[in-house]
Design a protein with these regions (language model features):
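Aromatic "clamp/platform" in nucleotide-sugar-dependent glycosyltransferases that forms part
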Residues: 302, 321
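Short hydrophobic beta-strand element within catalytic cores of glycosyltransferases
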Residues: 329, 338-341, 351
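A short, well-ordered alpha-helix in the C-terminal region of glycosyltransferases
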Residues: 139, 374, 381-396, 402-408
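A conserved mid-protein helix/loop that constitutes part of the nucleotide-sugar donor-binding site
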Residues: 53-61, 237, 241-260, 366
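Donor nucleotide-sugar binding/catalytic pocket of nucleotide-sugar-dependent glycosyltransferases
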Residues: 92-93, 172-224
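Conserved acidic donor-binding segment of nucleotide-sugar-dependent glycosyltransferases
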Residues: 353-354, 358-365, 374-380
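A short helix/loop element that forms part of the nucleotide-sugar donor recognition site in Leloir-type
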Residues: 28, 111, 216-232, 285-288
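Nucleotide-activated donor-binding/catalytic signature segment of Leloir-type glycosyltransferases, i.e.
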Residues: 284-301
């Protein structure tokens, strides 16, 4: 299957994001700089782009409430400063380029090294490809006692040629400079092992995976009041998608599959809850235009609070090519919506096949349409799957338990290091920092 590419950043959703975060996060004033006089352990959490703050909601606040002093680092942007304020943590802006840019990357590395040298944190957690690499190197050079690389996915899976090789080297170097590589799904860990990103002993998975779990009080079954506002008749079947509208998320295949669905179910509608992200896997102009003009496709743009939109859907589809662990699948499941997603890395972990949803191979529009039609034709099966999906989330992915595991694990890493067990070097990376 063909893959598409391009690069940049979307910012049109900022006001809505800030409004929703203020509703669902505890507000607190940002710290200009964590106090060195405090005995609390200091953790620096780094990401490349402030947009990634969307996946950190609750994580930073939980660490802070557990007794950590937290500093969030990313490229400059209002999302960085606002997220830090909402989570009650410090923030530092260091420009980092998403694309390969040797000179700019070196400058970013020096700035990260200076920051860590000044703050002297007990722990670092860097994620996303560029911040993960530069942060891991800077942390090693500064001798940070506990260095965590949080692997949220492998971009190299959908790349080829020289670029794939460069990304592989970057992942391997980030892992080599870290004590622990946390993976947010079992299949991602297995893929990292298969690709030789790191040794099996260094790659860790906490519990059943997921970065933050899901807020089951926010994402839950309930009445839907959005259909009229979205222009959807009350009784028509609605197929939904939530996320960035990009090629890596399988949008070209989904649009083709929807036309096949309409041939059988002409009353169906497709609800796309997301935005056109001008990233490396951006959609082409022709496909964008087709989506915007299609009479049965409803495009919301960026939505900060997606919870009520799941209640509009009869089936949620994520035809992705790669994931770490897709939050949107958990959110749909918690809302009692069956999901059709792929056997790709990460996404296969987010569904119990034939119980909470259906798994299909990536890249096949026919597989998408057939799976969706199976569910649309059988309301009772959809109901059973939805109930099973919510029960599965309640058993495995409630956010407070998922984040509690992270806090407990991080405290165990600090206990090992602060009590004098191998604070740096290969011995610490490979044997001292074992998971609980």
């Amino acid at each position: 299957m063909s893959r598409r590419s391009g690069d940049s950043t979307n910012t049109t959703f900022l006001p809505a994001f800030l409004h929703a975060r203020s509703r669902f996060s505890a507000s607190a004033a940002p710290l200009a700089e964590p106090l060195r006089s405090s005995p609390s352990p200091h953790i620096v959490v780094g990401i490349t782009n402030p947009q990634t703050c969307m996946v950190l909601g609750g994580r930073l606040r939980t660490l802070r409430e557990a007794g950590f002093r937290v500093t969030l680092v990313s490229s400059p942007g209002e999302l960085l400063t606002r997220t830090a304020a909402l989570e009650g943590v410090g923030s530092v802006a260091i420009p980092m380029r998403r694309e390969i840019a040797p000179f700019a990357d070196f400058v970013s590395l020096v700035r990260l090294w200076r920051l860590l040298h000044r703050l002297k944190p007990e722990m670092t957690e860097f994620s996303t490809p560029k911040a993960g690499l530069l942060g891991a190197i800077a942390g090693m050079l500064c001798g940070v006692p506990a260095r965590v690389y949080f692997l949220r996915g492998l971009k190299l899976e959908t790349c080829t040629g020289v670029k794939r090789r460069i990304l592989w080297v970057a992942e391997k170097l980030a892992a080599a400079c870290s004590h622990v590589v946390l993976c947010n799904s079992d299949s991602l860990r297995n893929q990292a092992i298969a690709l030789g990103v790191a040794s099996e002993s260094k790659l860790r998975l906490l519990g059943s995976g997921s970065s933050n779990g899901v807020d089951v009080e926010r994402f839950k079954p309930g009445p839907c009041g959005l259909r009229e506002r979205l222009g959807l008749p009350p009784d028509v079947p609605v197929v939904g998608f939530v996320g960035r509208l990009t090629s890596d998320k399988g949008l070209p295949e989904l649009i083709e599959a929807f036309d096949a669905i309409l041939a059988v179910k002409p009353e169906a509608h497709l609800l796309l809850v997301g935005w056109f992200d001008a990233a490396e896997d951006a959609l082409g102009n022709d496909l964008r235009s087709r989506i915007k003009k299609h009479p049965r496709i409803h495009l919301t743009g960026y939505v900060a609070d997606t919870a009520p939109y799941y209640r509009v859907m009869d089936v949620m589809v994520l035809p992705t090519w790669r994931e770490g662990f897709p939050n949107v699948v958990l959110e749909a499941a918690a809302t009692g919506i069956p999901v059709v997603t792929t056997l790709s890395t990460g996404s296969r972990d987010a569904v119990v096949p034939e119980v909470t949803g259906l798994l299909i191979p990536p890249g096949f529009p026919v597989a998408i349409s057939e799976a969706v039609l199976q569910l649309l034709r059988n309301p009772e099966r959809r109901r059973r799957m939805g109930e099973a999906a919510r029960a599965w989330v309640l058993d495995n992915y409630v956010n407070r338990r998922v984040l509690g595991r992270t806090v407990h694990y991080y405290q165990s890493l600090l206990d090992q290091n602060l009590s004098g067990v191998a604070t740096s070097g290969p011995a610490a990376r490979d044997s001292a920092l074992n998971p609980i």
